[in-house]
Every structure is written in structure tokens, then in C-alpha cells.
Amino acid sequence: MFFEARRSLHPAPPWAPLPLKSSMTLRLRAESPADHAAIHALTEAAFRDAAHSSHTEQFIVDALRARGELSVSLVAEMDGKVIGHVAVSPVTISDGSTGWFGLGPISVLPAWQGQGIGAALMHAALEALRQQAAHGCVLLGEPAYYGRFGFRAEPGLVLRGVPAEYFQALCLQPPLAQGEVQYSPAFEATA
């Protein structure tokens, strides 16, 4: 099920670290079929020069969509152009906990990075999960960045093969799940 943004953020959300150009309007909304090619292209561009990337993130989003596993898929649109995207999909946890999701990939076109668009997408995705009564969310990413959204490494939640400090969780409804987390097979997509 997709989350539909009920309002435009104009000119920028209050949590944006840098103001957007005053003549621009940022709009967050659920993806539509017409957005698929733009999401693929912007995801590829966003991760093209990232040293930490497998450079398959665009294929992961495509595979999640093909499997019907995009629980939340939001785009950031500026003056009619899709410039950002966030994907959220279900994860499984070895303790049997339900209602947990993985956030990512999250992408912003390089020319628009550092202007609060990623933060706006993060807040909107987490709000969509709250509206779905999700129990929690996990992600793989930079602790210094994602910590400001409430994410932190939890010793009881493990993603095999990943340094513990980069695998982070946000519990939305206690209790916190415990165990090994498994993402969708879509995360193995390479084309």
C-alpha cells in the first residue's frame, strides 16, 4: 500500500538544514507508474559515485516493485520533476516479530543533495509507517546522519555480514524486536 502525501511542503519542510530556493515548491507524494523510469534514473545517479555502494540500488527498487513489496514508495518532486525517492519494504526477524520494515534505498539527485530533501523523505516515510501501525524500521547507513531521525544500533538486532554500528533500528511500538533481520530477496538484484 502506498502512502499519499496530503499536503505539499512549501517552500521547505521545517527540518530542512538548508532553505530551498524560494521560487521552488517541494512536493512529496506516492509514486505513480509514470515515475518508474525517473526513479530508476535518479537512484542510479544518486549512488553512481558512492564508494559504499554496490551500484545496484536502482535494480533493488525495480525488484521490490515487481515483487509487490514496496510498502511505502514516495517521490520528492520539484516543479514537476522527480528529484528524490524513498523505498520501504517488509523485513523478517528471526524472533517472529511482525510489522518491521527496512527503509532504503533513499535517493536524491546529486544536484539537489544537501538541501533537506532526503530529510523530508525520511520524515514522510516514517510518518507513513506510523500510519500503518508499523512496529519498527531498520536501515543500513551512516550513524551520524540517521541518528538524528532516532535510529541507533541495537545489539539485539543483527544483519549478518554488516558492521553493527551501520545497521540501525527505530522502534515505533515496543517491544523492540530481537534477532537476525532478513531483507527481501529483491536486495540481491543486479539487473
Sequence positions of predicted segments:
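Conserved active-site alpha-helix within GNAT-family acetyltransferase domains
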Residues: 131-135, 140-164
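Conserved acetyl-CoA-binding loop-helix of GNAT-fold acetyltransferases
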Residues: 103, 108, 114-127, 139
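A conserved beta-turn-beta hairpin within the catalytic core of GNAT-like acetyltransferases
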Residues: 91-103, 113
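Active-site rim helix/loop that mediates acceptor-substrate recognition in acyltransferases
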Residues: 40, 47-92
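A short beta-loop-alpha structural element at the N-terminal edge
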Residues: 26-39
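Conserved GNAT-family N-acetyltransferase fold
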Residues: 74, 84-86, 101, 106, ...
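C-terminal "cap" of GNAT-fold acetyltransferases
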Residues: 138, 159-191
